[in-house]
């Protein structure tokens, strides 16, 4: 099955809750998914460094 069709299928609401797939809402990546932000780690890092995610900042100690 083509990647684009898998992304579209994963974003649709499933008939049963157990069929839900966690995919990034921005790029469709299935791995490295962060539930709290509904995006993958790569998109999260990009958007957080640009300051587009409120309340998230780079940690330093």
Swiss-Prot record:
Positions that bind Zn(2+): 24, 27, 40, 43
Free-text cofactor note: Binds 1 zinc ion per subunit.
GO biological process, one term: translation
Cystine pairings recorded for this chain: none
Keyword annotations of the record: Metal-binding, Ribonucleoprotein, Ribosomal protein, RNA-binding, rRNA-binding, Zinc
Taxonomy, superkingdom: Bacteria
Keyword Acyltransferase: no
Record Pfam families: Ribosomal_S14
UniProt GO MF annotations: rRNA binding; structural constituent of ribosome; zinc ion binding
Zinc keyword on record: yes
SUBUNIT field: Part of the 30S ribosomal subunit. Contacts proteins S3 and S10.
Function: Binds 16S rRNA, required for the assembly of 30S particles and may also be responsible for determining the conformation of the 16S rRNA at the A site.
Entry-linked NCBIfam families: PRK08061.1
Similarity-based family: Belongs to the universal ribosomal protein uS14 family. Zinc-binding uS14 subfamily.
HAMAP family in alphabetical order: Ribosomal_uS14_2_B (MF_01364_B)
Listed name of the protein: Small ribosomal subunit protein uS14
Biological source species: Borreliella burgdorferi (strain ATCC 35210 / DSM 4680 / CIP 102532 / B31) (Borrelia burgdorferi)
Gene from which this protein is expressed: rpsZ
